[in-house]
């Protein structure tokens, strides 16, 4: 929670007054996770922190509507890194860190609030979130 959520809150709180003073448009880009869509096995704190970050980004988006600050949320699926190399569970539709970095950069340049990737995995996660909480639903990700 400290890194995935509170660090963002503290950094943005420290930066907002400076950003509002700027004449040019500023962009705050928060990187969430598809783990914010549904709870995943053995990842309760991670999922909760990313869900909090998603809600925070949505709130900031509305709070800064009539200012020079543009808020973006990037919601990736699994990204291959040294951390994910240690995972012992399936990571469907995993993308490279280079691909993720490219998508995050493009998100900062887009007109959309939220950028998700891979899109097909996003829709799978959304579909699972609409199902009743049942062990067989989460088995799709194991």
PLM features per residue range, with description:
Residues 76-86, 90:
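Short, flexible catalytic-loop segment of classical short-chain dehydrogenase/reductase
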Residues 40-44:
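Active-site loop immediately N-terminal to the catalytic Tyr-X3-Lys motif
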Residues 14-24:
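A short helix-coil junction within the Rossmann-fold of NAD(P)-dependent oxidoreductases
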Residues 33:
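Residue(s) in the substrate-gating loop at a strand-loop-helix junction
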Residues 73, 89-125:
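C-terminal helical subdomain
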Residues 38, 59-70:
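Active-site-adjacent segment of SDR/Rossmann-fold oxidoreductases
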């Amino acid at each position: 929670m400290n890194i995935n959520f509170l660090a963002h809150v503290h950094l943005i709180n420290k930066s907002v007054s400076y950003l509002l003073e700027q004449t040019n448009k500023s962009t705050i880009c928060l990187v969430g996770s598809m783990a914010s869509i549904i709870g995943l096995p053995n990842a309760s704190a991670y999922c909760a922190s990313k869900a909090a970050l998603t809600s925070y980004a949505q709130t900031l988006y509305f709070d800064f509507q009539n200012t020079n600050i543009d808020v973006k949320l990037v919601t990736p699926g699994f990204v291959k890194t040294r951390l994910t190399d240690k995972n012992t569970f399936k990571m469907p539709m995993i993308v490279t860190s280079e691909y993720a970095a490219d998508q995050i950069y493009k998100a900062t340049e887009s007109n959309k609030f939220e950028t998700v990737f891979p899109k097909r995995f996003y829709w799978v996660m959304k579909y699972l979130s609409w199902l009743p909480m049942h062990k067989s639903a989460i088995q799709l990700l194991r």
